[in-house]
A protein has these predicted regions:
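Conserved signature/switch motifs of ABC ATPase nucleotide-binding domains
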Residues: 141-144, 161-162, 194
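Conserved ABC transporter NBD signature motif
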Residues: 64-72
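Catalytic Walker B motif of ABC-type/P-loop ATPase nucleotide-binding domains
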Residues: 167-170
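ABC ATPase C-loop
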Residues: 135, 139, 159-160
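Conserved ABC ATPase signature
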Residues: 142-146, 150-152
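Helix-to-loop junction immediately C-terminal to a conserved catalytic motif
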Residues: 56
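Conserved ABC ATPase "signature" region
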Residues: 71-72, 109, 113, 120-137
Length: 254
């Protein structure tokens, strides 16, 4: 069953004072099945960030539709967008986006507070989640008291606390060292194995090699995709590297 359907998405920006028009996305089409783990890759300027902003309901396409479980994101009224985003989507960012004056626990629970869940319900969700992510002993600490990897795990817990249908991850390993990267990718693998759908935008071949499918964006369109199939992470890593080389040299996919 498709959880996300992107159909004919186009995004055109006009420069200031009515100057030249920039076509960031031309004609993007793809679907994501429930329980899939999909990575999106492409060179800088290919349209990845624009696409992610549209999928996150932070921006609207010039043309086309984005359907999340039958809901057309492009048709949601502005005053309803924040609540829809909170109830259906979870976000993991490169820079963590934690509030320094909040403990990790308060950061994680913020979406639940905004959704007005009861204290009991929040704690019932928080405790097993913190245990799974290995941050149960850090909940009373502040972001500046923990490592980058621990911050990112707290950010992942915040993304999961509302049991979202889809996790959107934007360069989630970009600010992490090698050890923390391995830990986060392991975490993503575990939550995906439990049925969580993940869509990750990344420059990292290593991060993408943990996904089940990799989409490549070029010049505002989905240029190519690779399915994991029976490939190991190492084999998928090589396939991704070869495709990125082809993209960089202007080759065409047969």
């Amino acid at each position: 069953m498709s959880i996300l359907e992107v159909n004919g998405v186009k995004k055109v920006y006009s420069t200031r004072f009515g100057g030249a028009r920039v076509e960031a996305l031309k004609n993007v089409n793809f679907t994501v099945e429930a329980g899939e783990y999909v990575a999106i890759m492409g060179e800088s300027g290919s349209g990845k960030t624009t696409l992610l902003n549209i999928l996150a309901a932070l921006d609207k396409p010039t043309a086309g539709t984005v359907m999340l479980e039958g809901n057309d994101l492009t048709a949601i009224r502005d005053k309803e967008v924040a609540a829809f985003r909170r109830d259906h989507l979870g976000f993991v960012f490169q820079e963590f986006n934690l509030l320094d004056t909040f403990t990790l626990e308060d950061n994680i629970l913020l979406p639940a507070v905004l959704a007005r869940l009861s204290y009991q319900e929040m704690q019932q969700r928080l405790k097993p989640l913190a245990q799974e992510l290995g941050i149960a002993d850090l909940l009373k600490k502040y972001p500046y008291e923990v490592s980058g990897g621990q911050k990112q795990r707290a950010a992942a817990a915040r993304a999961l606390i509302m049991k979202p249908r889809l996790i959107l991850a934007d360069e989630p390993t970009g600010a992490l060292d090698s050890k923390a990267t391995d830990e986060l990718l392991g975490l993503f693998g575990r939550i995906n194995a439990k049925g969580q759908t993940i869509l990750m935008v990344t420059h990292s071949v290593k991060a993408a090699s943990h996904a089940g499918r990799v989409l490549f964006i070029k010049d505002g369109e989905v240029f190519h995709q690779i399915y994991r199939g029976s490939s190991t992470n190492e084999q998928l890593y090589q396939k991704i590297s070869d495709t990125l080389t082809m993209l960089a040299t202007g080759g065409e996919q047969a």
